[in-house]
């Protein structure tokens, strides 16, 4: 239960640490499987597994898990069935099937195949830190995170969230870190970065497993490129790639943190998840405010 990506949202209103009420709210959007003709469906499932509440509470945070089911209908399968039906019509009626009729046949094919389609399931995890005032979503893309937020808002009813903003642009500050080779005292450079040319859309440089203090990197900065993503290590406790949108990618908690969960000697998978979640949220409760401080502090809501 260690998040691998981190997209934070600022809570604009106080949320009470009330697991029972939160569970009741999410019950309205509890996951149920797709119907025979439904292409997709999403809803919340118990983080600790079947039979457990829809909300797991620990250390002032409320953990949620959104499950999505998507029916898989390969385009090649649809095309093959369409061609067969269109061919039968054209052979029987000695005429060409036009676009409108082709579209209708396609819809019929999808309807017929849908009940037999395989399903793919995906889970997205997130938690509300009621003490620090953040929603944290483990998502590899903004689209995935926004879907989680939309579902949580629908279930919650009165949840006001927005992406945090800092006083200074993260891209400007991270570019300065590379240019001056000076970082905050609790940060060390990693070996990965993405630089982009602000005057040429799509022009970017990606480096991995390279010395970011090298002359090559300095030449890119001198040529006017700006940092969009930068790999760092924080206080020798975790490492991540910071994005200019304040998300963290490839988040990795180091052994100094993970070993604390092992020291608790959990007896079940649920106890292990609870231990991991408690440690992770306490660590991120320190990291996220510090992330904002690196870029001049978080802006007050307008």
UniProtKB/Swiss-Prot annotation:
The keyword Cytoplasm applies. May be involved in recombination. GO terms for molecular function: double-stranded DNA binding. It comes from Halorhodospira halophila (strain DSM 244 / SL1) (Ectothiorhodospira halophila (strain DSM 244 / SL1)). GO terms for cellular component: bacterial nucleoid; cytoplasm. PANTHER family: RECOMBINATION-ASSOCIATED PROTEIN RDGC (PTHR38103:SF1). Belongs to the RdgC family. Keywords: Cytoplasm, DNA recombination. The keyword rRNA-binding does not apply. HAMAP family: RdgC. This is Recombination-associated protein RdgC. NCBIfam families: PRK00321.1-5. Its main location: cytoplasm. It is found in: Cytoplasm, Nucleoid. The gene is rdgC. Signal peptide: none annotated. It holds the Pfam family RdgC. GO terms for biological process: DNA recombination; regulation of DNA recombination.
